[in-house]
């Protein structure tokens, strides 16, 4: 079993505190009508949560898979960088009236930043995967 440093847990729980509401809001917004006042309000919250969670995740060291840079960053951190780029790009697109580009970027953000990243986070050897699927970590 991997021994995680104490600040690792703080970062992971802060990441969870932002990603879980982002996932709920993102899912809700994907299935609801677009363009309403509520959509615009929730969209801003969603983007702030995604930017925050991606920024927090950059400080979480990779303990599973290859470490690509500075013995800290792994492949999953590439999704953080893409999220940090996509959030303002999607916001700028909608402010310019580029709804098709905005829609594409938001779907990309949801699939890449939430679904794919979430899948990799639950893999064996990662903290959340071990927490959910390995009863030894809970005891």
Task: Specify the residue positions occupied by each region the protein language model found.
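Alpha-helical membrane insertion/targeting regions
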Residues: 1-139
